[in-house]
Amino acid sequence: MTRSIVSLQVGQCGNQVGLKFWEGISAEHGIDVDGKYIGDRPDQELHRIGVYYNESSSGSYVPRAAMLDLEPGVLMAIKNSKRGQLFHPDNFAYGQSGAGNNWAKGHYTEGAELVETALDIIRREAETCDVLQGFQVTHSLGGGTGSGMGTLLVSKIREEYPDRMMCTYSVLPSPKVSDTVVEPYNCTLSIHQLIENADCVFAIDNEALYNICYNTLKIEQPSYDELNSLISSVMSGITCSLRFPGQLNADLRKLAVNLVPFPRLHFFAVGHAPLAASNSAGYRSLSVPELAGQMFDRNNMMAEIDPREGRYLTAAVYFRGKVSTKEVEDEMTLMQTKNSAYFVEWIPHNIKTSVCDIPAAGEKISSAFIGNTTAIEATFKRFGNQFRSMFRRKAFLHWYKSEGMDELEFSEAESNLADLVSEYQQYGEATADGVEGYEEEGYENDHPEDDEE
């Protein structure tokens, strides 16, 4: 039984990142722009194709995806692009007026009007799955649609499918790649929702993406397209274990069981290797130790954090290409032994490894990384401080109140974010004796029927 994932792309950023993701994984599965299979290794490429694609009666493979936005521009551009034929034409839903970078418009007014249409698409996709394992959402938290309507959809889906997994790829705003002054509001209100309604949040920081492009890839003025390509490469690496046969973390629930020690602490930093400027890429010998070193290097992480300022609760690493499983495991043991101060001692064996024979497009070997580190509190503190300095003066609040929002919701979001920061601090400093309830919490695997492939 194939256990499928339904994807939602919400807002401009979510749809542009989503399109890059589908381009990347279609190439890996041998699917052309019209959804036809043109690969040469069907036993590998098609074995679990049903996770992300639905096979139509004409034999083409259609992404299980809903494309959603509050204005038509980006979706029309996708529909008319060369990949436009890949998607189901009925799975595009858009409003006309946009959210104007206002979370309340996305969550309470404009977005609420479109949400029923969106849920119809999602139900229709869910019904075509043999077994639905869960949902993945790509969106940004800085604007109005991805943040406001994105989190509205997450909460509606949670109500309707309470026992399915909910994972989000959430792009956090940055002053270097900034669109709008109210980003701290939109971001904090969104995180407030994601703490309660998501199982796994891959936090991708525009600031870190910008720094990777500028410092490592030597791109003087990174475009959104280049930032999105970075996100799509890490999404492809993280999802390879879901899409190809015989892997650790072969579904979203197992991924969460391995990475989430306490239900609220489900915000992950992600990374990808190799990263090198195109003119120097040919000069490096890629080996497992080299990739491992790059993955754990703060300059390669897609979150603007310094892992040395916190401790890893858990981590998962995925190697792709012709690499030996034993070498990967030995390297990770060595990495953990050498850096034991940066891993909590009360979760033994907290780095999970996985090897996938099928390389990423254009790479001989590559790797992806997911880290649940307490250092991510720095990101939340950054938004919390920006939020506080505006909220104290009630700056721009009238834009939100005029859509029917209450100040109380702002205060609740602020205190939920502050609680999250202090929980990360508490577990970062805890010793083996000081942690209670670790065994009891986390995810019960109460869906044994899901484990059947």
From Swiss-Prot:
Composition-biased stretches (Acidic residues): 436-453
Q: Where is this region: Disordered?
A: 431-453
Arranged from A to Z, the UniProt key words for this protein are:
Cytoplasm, Cytoskeleton, GTP-binding, Magnesium, Metal-binding, Microtubule, Nucleotide-binding
One Pfam annotation reads Tubulin_C
- Record-annotated residues binding Mg(2+)? 71
Q: Which residues form a coiled coil?
A: none
Residues reported to bind GTP:
12, 71, 140, 144-146, 206, 228
- What is an example of a GO molecular function annotated in this UniProt entry? structural constituent of cytoskeleton
Tell me the GO BP annotations in alphabetical order.
microtubule-based process
Cofactor(s) needed: Mg(2+)
Please name the SUPFAM superfamilies in this protein's record: Tubulin C-terminal domain-like (SSF55307), Tubulin nucleotide-binding domain-like (SSF52490)
What subcellular compartments does it reside in? Cytoplasm, Cytoskeleton
Major location category of this protein = cytoplasm
GO CC annotation terms, alphabetical: cytoplasm; microtubule
On assembly, the entry states: Dimer of alpha and beta chains. A typical microtubule is a hollow water-filled tube with an outer diameter of 25 nm and an inner diameter of 15 nM. Alpha-beta heterodimers associate head-to-tail to form protofilaments running lengthwise along the microtubule wall with the beta-tubulin subunit facing the microtubule plus end conferring a structural polarity. Microtubules usually have 13 protofilaments but different protofilament numbers can be found in some organisms and specialized cells.
Query: What is this protein's function?
Result: Tubulin is the major constituent of microtubules, a cylinder consisting of laterally associated linear protofilaments composed of alpha- and beta-tubulin heterodimers. Microtubules grow by the addition of GTP-tubulin dimers to the microtubule end, where a stabilizing cap forms. Below the cap, tubulin dimers are in GDP-bound state, owing to GTPase activity of alpha-tubulin.
Q: Describe the family membership recorded for this protein in Swiss-Prot or TrEMBL.
A: Belongs to the tubulin family.
> What is the protein's given name?
Tubulin beta-1 chain
Query: Can you name the source organism?
Result: Chondrus crispus
**Gene designation per UniProt:** TUBB
